[in-house]
Swiss-Prot record:
Subcellular location: Mitochondrion
Keyword set, alphabetical order: Mitochondrion, Transit peptide
Domain of life per record: Eukaryota
Protein's recorded name: Altered inheritance of mitochondria protein 24, mitochondrial
GO cellular component, one term: mitochondrial inner membrane
Family membership noted in the UniProt record: Belongs to the AIM24 family.
InterPro entries, per database record: AIM24 (IPR002838), AIM24_sf (IPR036983), Trp_RNA-bd_attenuator-like_dom (IPR016031)
Principal place of residence: mitochondrion
Residue range covered by the transit peptide: 1-30
Pfam families recorded: AIM24
Amino acid sequence: MRPLQGVRTLSWTRVVPRAHRQTRYIQIRAAPSGVPSVNGDNLPLASTPSSVESRDARFDVVGAPYSLLSVSLSASQNLYTRRGTLVGLSGKADNVVSTLSVLEPFRRAIVGVPFLYQKISSPSPVTALVSVRSPNTSFAVVNVNGSVDWMVAQRRALLAWTGRSLNIKPTINANLSLSHWGSSEVTGRGLIALVGNGQLYSVELKDGEQYIAHPSNVVAYTMASNPPRPYRFKSTTLNFQVPGLKTLPRLLQNAKFVRDVSDSKAYKTTMQWFHKLRTWSRMTIWGDRLFLQFDGPMTILVQSRGPRLNDVLSAQEANEIANVPSGFTSPPPRSTEGEKTEKNPLEDKPEEEKTEAEKAVSNISGLTRSVAELEQEIQGTSRSVAKLRKDGKVEIEEVARSN
């Protein structure tokens, strides 16, 4: 049908009311909180307990986030808190005795651990409030029951503690071990309060599980038979090496000119600067690859905001972790309790000072007896009798000998 000329064609559109329009909503929900294995895709991260108690004291963490520590003490119980952290105290103020305690200043000053603490005691029960000046910190309380010892990895993490048999000893890295520089070993029975940057969380490792953590985020961990070991992730960055005589051929190492140069003061000063530059680069440029590996069973307290790596690891520890091959960790040390092995004294004795018998014994593999034992076996066992003569002298007479 042809449209009529001069007549305008009308077009219409159907408008749907708002109530009948189709709308899609996006719902965002929190993931279900399960407790999967730590070696799986998820990590069982739990919050630290807000209160712990013993027979003589109770620690309660209050605030959101945790910013205050409430300490309830029984009569004649001592509380040690870091100097300048006491906020308030309730109870009979006339009975409270507060003294400034200097705890092992020489040992703690060497490792950078605070040694000025305030000792609070009272013959009547009191309640004290403890806090820190930093606004981005939170508290965690731990009940040390004597069955498991703790290692506080951060220098300023230990805030307060109470307990008559609680022993806190600063540790020093003397043999390039993985123990943190400036850590404190906590043994005995009592309550301790730890402070960290940001939020504090607890990681529970079961037997056979492993966890890799950055040393600046580790606040404390339980001391097990397997101490934490160095771990370094693989990377394609260029390794910084310090040139030395060992990289030269053996013929050049024995040359007189090379020996004279290596003994000069200028060469030694240059090598010292090279080593400092390598240590600085490992702690700043490649510092994000330095980690610690923990083996279960173990409990680890981690903080969400870690300090600088320089505040946690010493230069020797950074070099030790950096020297570990990428992605490789040494096997955990085995327990040697009950296994006593005697070291052969001939191993440390110079060859020119050994006798003919000692040289013969040292050349025999698998021989466990010493030279004195072999000579005694050859000579046999003799029995002698001491007789007192009339003139007052002692005469020793051999009675029998058995080979």
